[in-house]
């Protein structure tokens, strides 16, 4: 009996060292013991750390307000204020809807909740006006996976080309195959106007790259569980698939919709047909963006989109052509503007790059002449700067390079100022 009492006294908590007599409870697990006091302490530590982690996660996932979203877009994208407002509200409502559905899922369902339906976005506007960049910047702010697809590369299932499921694969790849993250991402489909059907009436023959693609996109736009082949390509019966629910993926589809303004103008009776009608070849004579703001579903149907496809794109945002003044701002003002990027490259070679006002205006004018908008600015900058950047690493005597209007037009060589000896040696 004394020996049993002695062995009980020898049992101690493996963590704090207290004996069985000094604590209320001693729990055995294999060759170790833990007392009730250590268990309580562990629970407090876990609760504290989990609480901090949840707080950090909440701060990280704080949903920005529409005004904050628009202000963030302003730091990267010049102009397009009406489109920014529409996109900011649409994106805010979309992710607010996701949070609401998660909250409803966590609490008791005592009464039926109002169902919030997803609102995908249609963007109308000319090439080089910033449609893609707006979508990319939104994804950057929200820290969600983002994928870009070209509608012209898509074909209906069973035909040569790219299946619509490959769009979802791109999103999965952007999310490092994290399905949960991918299901909250953004997919941008460009050139959607190029998949309009060939006539307003339903086609008798197969239109595999037009109406057929629109039909294939319907399900993923609305929400479906798609089977995605991890390696891409066509589906085979024996391969493994990743199941991806598209219900909460935000789709932004965009296109130039050249010719849609005529459809809208005809509906409004602004133009007639026949002799005596003044025909203008200059788009500048009519504010196309203002006309696009009056777009109605029947106009898009006449253009070649099927009604079911239009119905999945309730939010419409229009972007305008950038004028010379706006293009100059694109070159200089955004946080990652082209001028700032090239100036940084020159700094790495211990030189200062300076553009005069007339040089910036000339670059903007060339982009307007080429009808490439902001998208063509980098190519023009490269044409001007590549010869200089080729020689600069070998020119230790150069401290500053000045680009003026004549240089931008190709009529003169850039002015190169000598480097200060102290700066180069430093």
UniProtKB/Swiss-Prot annotation:
InterPro entries: AAA+_ATPase, ATP-dep_Clp_protease_ClpX, ATPase_AAA_core, Clp_ATPase_C, Clp_protease_ATP-bd_su_ClpX, ClpX_bact, P-loop_NTPase, Znf_CppX_C4. SMART domains: AAA, ClpB_D2-small, zf-C4_ClpX. GO terms for biological process: cell division; proteolysis involved in protein catabolic process. GO terms for cellular component: HslUV protease complex. Pfam families: AAA_2, ClpB_D2-small, zf-C4_ClpX. Zn(2+) binds at residues 13, 16, 35, 38. GO terms for molecular function: ATP binding; ATP hydrolysis activity; ATP-dependent protein folding chaperone; protein dimerization activity; unfolded protein binding; zinc ion binding. PROSITE patterns: CLPX_ZB (PS51902). Keywords: ATP-binding, Chaperone, Metal-binding, Nucleotide-binding, Zinc. ATP binds at residues 126-133. Residues 1-54 form the ClpX-type ZB domain. Belongs to the ClpX chaperone family. HAMAP family: ClpX. ATP-dependent specificity component of the Clp protease. It directs the protease to specific substrates. Can perform chaperone functions in the absence of ClpP. Component of the ClpX-ClpP complex. Forms a hexameric ring that, in the presence of ATP, binds to fourteen ClpP subunits assembled into a disk-like structure with a central cavity, resembling the structure of eukaryotic proteasomes. This is ATP-dependent Clp protease ATP-binding subunit ClpX. The lineage of its organism: Bacteria, Bacillati, Actinomycetota, Actinomycetes, Mycobacteriales.
């Amino acid at each position: 009996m004394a020996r049993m009492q002695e062995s009980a006294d020898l049992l101690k908590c493996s963590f704090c060292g207290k004996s069985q007599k000094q604590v209320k409870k001693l729990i055995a697990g294999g060759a170790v013991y833990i007392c009730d006091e250590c268990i309580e302490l562990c629970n407090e530590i876990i609760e504290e750390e989990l609480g901090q982690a949840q707080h950090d996660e909440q701060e990280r996932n704080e949903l920005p307000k529409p005004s904050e979203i628009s202000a963030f877009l302003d730091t990267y994208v010049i102009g397009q204020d009406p489109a920014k407002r529409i996109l900011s509200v649409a994106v805010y409502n979309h992710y607010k809807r996701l949070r609401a559905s998660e909250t409803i899922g966590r609490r008791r369902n005592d009464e039926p909740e109002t169902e919030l339906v997803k609102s995908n976005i249609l963007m109308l506007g000319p090439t080089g006006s910033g449609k893609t960049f707006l979508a990319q910047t939104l994804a950057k702010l929200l820290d969600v996976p983002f994928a870009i697809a070209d509608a012209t590369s898509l074909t209906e299932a069973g035909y040569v080309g790219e299946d619509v499921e490959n769009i979802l694969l791109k999103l999965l790849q952007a999310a490092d195959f994290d399905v949960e993250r991918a299901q909250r991402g953004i997919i941008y489909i460009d050139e959607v106007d190029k998949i309009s059907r060939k006539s307003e009436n339903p086609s008798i023959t197969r239109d595999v790259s037009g109406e057929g693609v629109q039909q294939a996109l319907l399900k993923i736009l609305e929400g479906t569980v798609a089977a995605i082949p991890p390696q891409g390509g066509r589906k085979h019966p024996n391969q493994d698939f990743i199941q991806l629910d598209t219900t909460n993926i935000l789709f932004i589809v965009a296109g130039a919709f050249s010719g849609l303004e005529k459809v809208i103008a005809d509906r409004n009776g602004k133009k007639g047909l026949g002799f005596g009608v003044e025909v203008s070849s200059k788009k500048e004579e009519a504010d196309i963006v203002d006309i696009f703001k009056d777009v109605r579903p029947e106009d898009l149907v006449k253009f070649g989109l099927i009604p079911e496809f239009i119905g999945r794109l309730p939010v419409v945002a229009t972007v305008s052509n950038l004028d010379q003044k706006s293009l100059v701002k694109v070159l200089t003002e955004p946080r990652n503007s082209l001028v700032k990027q090239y100036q940084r490259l020159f700094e790495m070679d211990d030189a200062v790059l300076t553009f005069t006002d007339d040089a910036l205006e000339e670059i903007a004018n060339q982009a307007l002449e080429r009808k490439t908008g902001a998208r063509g600015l980098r190519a023009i900058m490269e044409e001007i700067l590549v010869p200089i950047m080729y020689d600069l690493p070998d020119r230790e005597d150069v401290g500053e390079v000045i680009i003026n209007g004549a240089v931008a037009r190709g009529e003169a060589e850039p002015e190169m100022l000598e480097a200060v000896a102290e700066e180069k040696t430093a």
